[in-house]
Amino acid sequence: MRRTIEYFGRIALISIALLGCEVSDFDLQDNPNFLTPKSADPEYLLNEIQYQFQSLMGLMILNTDDLMRYEAMTDTYGDLVSVTVLDTEWESYFEALNNSKTIEALAEKDETLLFHNAINKLLLGYLTITMVDYMGAIPYTEAVVPSEYPNPGLESGIDIYKKVLNDIDRAILDIENSTFNFSTDLFYDSDKDKWIAFANSFKLKILVQTRLASSEIGVSDIALAINELLEKDLIDSETEDFQYTFSTVEEPESRHRYFRRGYVSNFGQYMGNYFMFMLKDSKSVADPRLRYYLYRQSDSSPFSIVPYSTCLQESNVDYCYIGDFYRGLDHGESRTGFGDNEERTVYGLYPGGGTFDEDQFVSAPKTSTHLDGAGILPLLTSSFVKFLRAEAALMLSTGEDPEKLLREAIQDSMDKVLSFGEVDSDFESTDEEVEAYIDEVLFNFNNVATNEQKLDIIITEYYLAAFGNSMESYNAYRRTGYPSNIQVPIDNDNPTFPRSFPYSARAVEINSSLTQKLNTDRVFWDTNPEGFIK
């Protein structure tokens, strides 16, 4: 990974050049920000796509952090998933799509750009699958071709998934046949073997994601398709993890969003009590990642302010305060803003590049032992891939051992988190603590009766390992309904959980082919019944 100031300075200049005029309605009309093959430098353009990729993925993750209880949701689902929530993300995606098509056009005439275009197609494919997973049908083939399609129509998620799968296969071939590298590859430093491992793992993710509707995307035997992938290179070690690494640069702003939220100014959010409880108290041993994930700013009692002053006596509040100065809020708690910003628990060392918790009890902006925001965006790690393989082994009988994969998935997560930032502290977790944690999980796994109960354990551990990438949890929750003990909003026992996100209100206003959708609409691979999750 590269974190150089020179790169971010270059990105700033590119961004100014590309985005100097107001960005608007990328899927709909001619836009002076769009580059054409005649005006584009492929190196700079692929740099820009990498920047757009991490920015858009980071924003999408923020959109589901509170939905999935990592942060506390202090609104209703309807307020949280409103028609304006994806305005910025929608525009960013279609700018990236236009840049992607420009690189593709350049590569058709220049064989030295095979590797460039392969990276381009994989990054754009990942963004596209994310957009489909959040919204279902989106403009795709007709998008960013305003001369032919001034009001591009929707394309089904099924058709888009099929096209992305084809793009992955083509990208792998192009990587294998390419002879020229990309000079500023921010993910794998032009390591072609790692890009191929990512491409295969991305395909695995798609197959597991669609296991309830695999025939819709033309996969008649999903277990066979997955087994064929298992014979190929996959992400199976931390050195192959697909992640974006942030820097410590402030101008232009290049630090992790979690760090900017918790350490640059007073923390305006609350961590979710359910998530903190799961780390601290859901097993007989605390999660060894606890002090790496979370940082406590204060050792003061919370009971002098609302809601803590009353919520212990309120039957609808599940947690209120979990103790040991882990101060957060329950899911759906709307009583906020009582001046305790510097007493709340905030993001810690991993993944946002904050502070490791050594009982300092100092407000986050005043700490000096943090990583200055040089965190990571964990997108598809060896841990995630092994959780997906464990699910496939259990539910699709792929032939692998789900217990073994569960152990390896948790171990990979522990190794990654506990080595992050090279902590040297009396409070750092030990190998013995990790072993005790994993042993308890596997004991529970082997002492439940049904595969559904085993899947609940796999997905719950996936949920805990996916801190920093709530998209994985959001998808798994809709696909499986797990974790089964996830907290329901305290003010509503029967809420309408957003099974998808609405379209950008701005896009619907301008594009006559779009009609606003409901957040109860299910994406094609979510075949579970209405009211399945809360």
What are these regions (language model features)?
Residues 58-66, 136-139, 403, 472-475:
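Beta-strand acidic-aromatic groove motif in beta-rich domains, primarily in extracellular
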Residues 386, 394, 411-534:
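C-terminal functional modules
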Residues 1-19:
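Sec-dependent bacterial lipoprotein signal peptides
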